[in-house]
């Protein structure tokens, strides 16, 4: 289930963002978190596993005109590689339902994942 991050979930977000390979240190993680929080057209979404109730995936998205750009996709270590494709398809469908008026697209770094999810959905 996709949920939009609340202010009181910053530690969860910072923890998941720290697994992102493009954020080298805690200062970079904090800057990225602050960047998302500084504009209402940006959201951080968390995927809550329905069985464990753990937050297992973080998505950083930005609404740009009629598009939703998926800027970050971060899986927690508890998500096995073999689960990522299936989970990605479920997340893609949930994003379509949550943002029905938006075209879903990836950034330069996430486009290949978004395209794979789109082709399989």
What are these regions (language model features)?
Residues 1-28:
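Short amphipathic alpha-helix that is part of the acyltransferase structural core
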Residues 56-59, 73:
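Conserved GNAT-family N-acetyltransferase fold
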Residues 40-57:
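Conserved beta-hairpin
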Residues 27-35:
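Short, basic/aromatic recognition patches
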Residues 66-78:
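Conserved acetyl-CoA binding element of GNAT-fold acetyltransferases
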Residues 96-112, 118-119:
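Conserved GNAT acetyl-CoA-binding A-motif
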Residues 80-97:
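Conserved acetyl-CoA-binding loop-helix of GNAT-fold acetyltransferases
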């Amino acid at each position: 289930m996709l949920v939009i991050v609340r202010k009181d979930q910053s530690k969860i977000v910072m923890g998941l963002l720290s697994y992102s390979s493009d954020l080298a240190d805690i200062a970079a993680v904090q800057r990225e978190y602050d960047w998302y929080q500084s504009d209402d057209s940006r959201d951080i979404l968390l995927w809550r596993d329905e069985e464990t109730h753990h937050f297992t995936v973080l998505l950083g998205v930005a609404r740009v005109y009629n598009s939703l750009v998926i800027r970050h996709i971060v899986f927690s270590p508890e998500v096995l590689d073999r689960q990522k494709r299936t989970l990605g398809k479920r997340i893609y469908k949930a994003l379509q339902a949550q943002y029905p008026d938006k075209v879903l697209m990836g950034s330069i770094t996430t486009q290949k994942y978004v395209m794979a999810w789109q082709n399989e959905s």
